[in-house]
Amino acid sequence: TPLVFGAHPYGVPASGLGDAAVVEGLSPAELDAAHQRWIRPDNAQVFVVGDTTLAETVSLLEASFGDWKAPATPMPTKTYDVDVPAPEARIVLLNRPNSPQSVILGARVLDTRGTDDNTVLLAANEVLGGSFLSRINMNLRETKGWSYGSRSGVTYNRDRLVYAVQAEVQADRTGDSIVELEKEITGFVGDNGVTAAELERTINGNVRELPGQFETSNSVLGGMVNIVKYDRPDDYYETIADKYRSLTADELAETARENFIYGDIVYVVVGDAEVVEPQLERTGLPYTVQQLDQ
């Protein structure tokens, strides 16, 4: 994450564990101050799904949290107004001796944000690498047989999104796999756009899976949270099917050209450097080699 986000808040690993030196230096007073600053009733929203009523729910909440008062200090806000590093195509190889497989993860930060309407973006990715029948998986798994599975996806945040491609491949085909990934992306944003069959499969798949996404209370809750988290209209899930049905191949191709840009993806490879490093020259990308503990 720091490789693509730099000093941006999203550059902190998603695990939330932070930096060991910083954690070791924290005091109980600092933790309490952070809790008081952020965990407060005027900065909270409650979502409830179940066999209940608003009156019953409010009564229970008042009983449990009625005495919880907001502090006098202003409610804090998060800022994402931090530039990310300019995209720079390269490979970072992390040496893991004797690994029979290599794990490849390539990523770039997109200009689009989670609060944008990304229906077309997600549909375009589904064709490229977001489903089992995607081009990336069909190439590396079904045609080449170098991987049990390869995929691409858009990592969702409120602010800047990340496009990522991932594959676990046999060690002696690491370099070739990166070449094929680049080839698929290049073709997708070039002359090898979305076919009629791919468009139909993507539309039908997304529309037909909608009912199954709300079979449980937890699924309904997740939909409610997403609407609020990403500033979506209340009727988002009622209108999304029509958005899928109106998709065109030209829309998907244009969105792909705007987002899946060839030539500026950072690849991180975990594998046996003795086997993998000699293969990286054929990718045409600059690379560095590091030990896992660096």
What are these regions (language model features)?
Residues 1-43, 67-115, 126-175, 197, ...:
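Non-catalytic beta-strand/loop surface segments
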Residues 50-55, 170-174, 272-274:
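Helix N-cap motif at beta-to-alpha junctions
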Residues 59, 113-118, 174-178, 278-279:
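Solvent-exposed, non-transmembrane alpha-helical starts
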Residues 63-72, 183-192, 282-292:
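A common structural junction motif
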Residues 150, 181, 202, 220-225, ...:
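Generic long, charged, amphipathic alpha-helical segments
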Residues 167-195:
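Extended amphipathic alpha-helical segments enriched in small hydrophobics
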Residues 200-207, 211:
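Small-residue-rich helix-loop
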